[in-house]
Amino acid sequence: MEEKKIRKVTLCDICHQSKAVMKRPKNLQKLCKECFYHVFETEIHNTIVDAQLFKPGDKVAIGASGGKDSTVLASVLKTLNEKYNYGLTLVLLSIDEGIVGYRDDSLATVKRNQIQYEMPLEIISYKDLYNWSMDEIVSCAGIRSSCTYCGVLRRQALDRGAAKLEIDHVVTGHNADDMAETVLMNLLRGDIARLERSCSILTSSEGSPIKRSKPFKYTYQKEIVLYAHYKKLDYFSTECSYAPEAFRGTARELLKALESVRPSCIMDIIYSGEHLVVAHKKKRTTEKYKNKPKKNIETEVNSDGSVNLTKKTDGSRCEKCGYLSSNKICKACVLLAGLEMNRPKVNIENNTAVEGSAKVMKTLEQLSF
């Protein structure tokens, strides 16, 4: 009679009682569901406390896209806010870029999350804000430029949405994988200036009083997916239709290849980026730079020839849209101005399709040259 094979059960490395259901990618620790929830949430809490991201009474907007990262972020922040008594008022802030078949479906998920988490929801539309949808921008500027436009417009839309809600802090679901990808992208481009921003857990737009932070800075994407799966969270999993053409996709594939050989490479890349930033800062404070006047200092010459040094006040505004900007024209307005140059051509093509060539011919006959 053939003996039955006994299947060995792997126990959790923490409680040593329950069956392990996952192995952590960062340290290969085997955990059961409950211990995984505890470790996952505690690490994020420690990140928030160490970076001093919040203070009691803060009104915080969660950048909600309906994807796994922002959905897990909303769930975890709600849990931590109640468990550790942060004293935060949490709201959901969504940006509708106007991508048919993608954003409209993901916003339906956000609206369900609003009910599940009992949080107010504000939706800011590109079309309402800029008079352009992302689909229109891509048809005009091409798919390869989509992330350039969307990144700039989205950052400003988040700031405008937060200002509308009288919020001074926005949290986003950028995770450790995203951070490592951005470090790689900036290194491949040779863009050390942007490296500091990509490694920082707390950032803000130039001239804007609104802070943006990334509580998931040290959280692996795989663990976020597992948390959403085991908690049975409602999220939208389809990738943006324009994302495959982005340069980030190249960095992502490179990161996956590196991770398969060295699982700790994600954290290693983030730490390396932070050390490069420190080295870059030290270089800027050498004697070569010390005697140069600082950009944020104004000199005022008195009648007796003495000089007063005063700091420039923040709050410069774009001459076109009136939004906070360190330049006369903000980057969003520069990009939109380039799009507007092609707007008449788009309109003529639309009229031709709808009303035929007769109207166009009649218009041309009325023109005087």
Swiss-Prot record:
CDD domains: CTU1-like
Sequence similarity: Belongs to the TtcA family. CTU1/NCS6/ATPBD3 subfamily.
HAMAP family according to UniProt: CTU1
Enzyme Commission identifier(s): 2.7.7.-
Name of the featured protein: Cytoplasmic tRNA 2-thiolation protein 1
Record GO cellular component, one term: mitochondrion
Protein task: Plays a central role in 2-thiolation of mcm(5)S(2)U at tRNA wobble positions of tRNA(Lys), tRNA(Glu) and tRNA(Gln). Directly binds tRNAs and probably acts by catalyzing adenylation of tRNAs, an intermediate required for 2-thiolation. It is unclear whether it acts as a sulfurtransferase that transfers sulfur from thiocarboxylated URM1 onto the uridine of tRNAs at wobble position. Prior mcm(5) tRNA modification by the elongator complex is required for 2-thiolation. May also be involved in protein urmylation.
UniProtKB keywords: Cytoplasm, RNA-binding, Transferase, tRNA processing, tRNA-binding
